[in-house]
Regions:
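Transmembrane-helix signature of 12-pass secondary carriers
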Residues: 1-175
């Protein structure tokens, strides 16, 4: 009976449309991930004025997402080994997208901070999983290049957040 080494097949594969699809979806998720993290900085001046926040309070409010990211990475990284990467990524995307949308309905800093923390769980949880997914499917010769391209989406998301904020914030407000 012949044995098949799946890792060897993946490592030696030629870059093909399947790899493009994995790269596209992972990069798109990272773009939204970057957008969701940076959007706080875009609305920060308005929030400070509207809620009369001191710089210290505003900084603390912003750090809740970072605490969530740390916890999310530690929770969803290992969890994906049990439930699968796609399920873990889906849960994380729902968390960071849903709670970022809910942030728009926050009426006070406490509600906003809770939403930022929970969104941070998804933001941090998606990171190790898209890296692992891209690494697992990428041919060995271009693995680090594909991960680097995918991660550049994080900066793209941040720039989109700032660019859209410049256009939308003056016309529609932060909510």
């Amino acid at each position: 009976m012949q044995k098949i080494d799946a890792n060897k097949i993946i490592d030696e594969a030629k870059f093909n449309p399947f790899h493009w699809m994995v790269l596209f979806w992972c990069a798109l998720i990272i773009i939204f991930d970057g957008y969701d993290l940076v959007i706080y900085g875009v609305v920060l001046p308005v929030l400070m004025k509207e809620w009369n926040l001191s710089p210290l309070e505003a900084g603390a409010l912003g750090s809740y997402a970072l605490f969530g990211m740390m916890a999310g990475a530690l929770i969803f990284g290992p969890l994906s080994d049990k439930i699968g990467r796609k399920k873990a990524i889906t849960i994380c995307v729902v968390l960071f997208s849903g709670f970022t949308v809910l942030n728009g309905f926050a009426t006070n800093p406490t509600e906003f901070g809770i939403c930022r923390f929970i969104a941070g769980l998804g933001i941090g949880g998606v990171m190790p999983n898209v890296v692992a997914l891209m690494s697992e499917y990428a041919p060995k010769k271009i693995r680090s290049t594909l991960v680097a391209i995918m991660f550049s989406g994080y900066s793209v998301g941040g720039m989109l957040s700032a660019g859209l904020g410049i256009v939308l914030l003056p016309n529609f407000g932060w909510q």
